[in-house]
Regions:
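Glycine-rich hexapeptide-repeat left-handed beta-helix
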Residues: 14-16, 22, 109, 116-220
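A generic structural signal for ordered alpha-helices
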Residues: 2-9, 52, 56, 74, ...
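Phosphate-binding glycine-rich loops and adjacent basic patches that engage nucleotide phosphates
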Residues: 1, 38-44, 56-59, 87-96, ...
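Short secondary-structure boundary segments
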Residues: 64-96, 148-154, 158, 209-220
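A generic local structural motif
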Residues: 47-49, 66, 84, 161, ...
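Terminal amphipathic alpha-helical/low-complexity segments used for targeting or macromolecular assembly
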Residues: 1-53, 58, 189, 195, ...
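Generic, low-specificity signal for short hydrophobic/alpha-helical stretches with a mild N-terminal bias
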Residues: 9-13, 42, 60, 78, ...
């Protein structure tokens, strides 16, 4: 699979960050500095700096029981629900939902993505209109703490990253209580059944019933 064809980078305020990358994961170490640079250049009539290095767009709803640590950008019409924990270095797109007891750190969430219930998203990128079911975990650290290697068919890609979660393609849905292993890449328009252990590279337009039972999705 072409792992660089699963995201529409026009569907995020961070588009510029992706332009010079060979692989999407290369943006992960750059998120913190990029947020500060971008935040200070935003239209102050539209984006408000509500705390140090935390910028919020128009019509954003932030529950008083949520926690937001900068640097962080939350784009227009997004809802941050009670108990959400944005742990720093996070870009949230337009019209997103970040829900109860969801923790996100060092990640980019594209427009219209939904992470609504009891999720962990670490060092990850979630594409346009992607959705995580309740309890989905995007794990970002191997048990042996070694650097993450992406295996794409016969190709091995050295990330030189100790922490990397998942890259989830546009319009992809991951079912409840699934666990996605570090360094996983999931193509666009793919559906993953609940309670699935996801690892490696999964193509676009697939239905993942289990890692041993992946079928093509009918395109309507």
């Amino acid at each position: 699979m072409d792992i660089n064809s699963i995201l529409d980078i026009d569907k995020t305020i961070s588009r510029e960050l992706f332009l010079d990358c060979t692989y999407y994961f290369e943006v992960l170490p750059k998120i913190k500095n990029y947020i500060v640079k971008l935040g200070n250049s935003l239209d102050k009539n539209k984006y408000k700096e509500i705390d140090t290095n935390i910028w919020v767009g128009e019509n954003v709803i932030i529950d008083k029981l949520s926690t937001i640590i900068g640097p962080c950008i939350i784009d227009d019409n997004t809802e941050i629900r009670p108990g959400a924990y944005l742990r720093g270095n996070v870009i949230i797109g337009k019209n997103c939902v970040i829900g109860n007891s969801t923790e996100i750190k060092n990640s980019i969430i594209f427009d219209y993505a939904q992470i609504p219930h009891y999720n962990y998203v670490g060092d990850s990128i979630l594409g346009y209109h992607s959705h995580l079911g309740a309890g989905v975990i995007l794990s970002n650290l191997k048990n042996d703490k070694s650097d993450i290697v992406i295996k794409n068919g016969n190709e091995k890609i050295e990330t030189n990253l100790r922490k990397m979660g998942a890259i989830v393609g546009d319009n992809t849905d991951i079912g409840c209580n699934s666990v996605v292993f570090p360094g996983s890449i999931i193509g666009k328009n793919t559906s993953i059944y609940p309670l699935t252990r996801v690892r490696g590279v999964i193509g676009s337009n697939k239905i993942v019933k289990s890692m041993d039972n992946i079928v093509n999705k009918e395109i309507k």
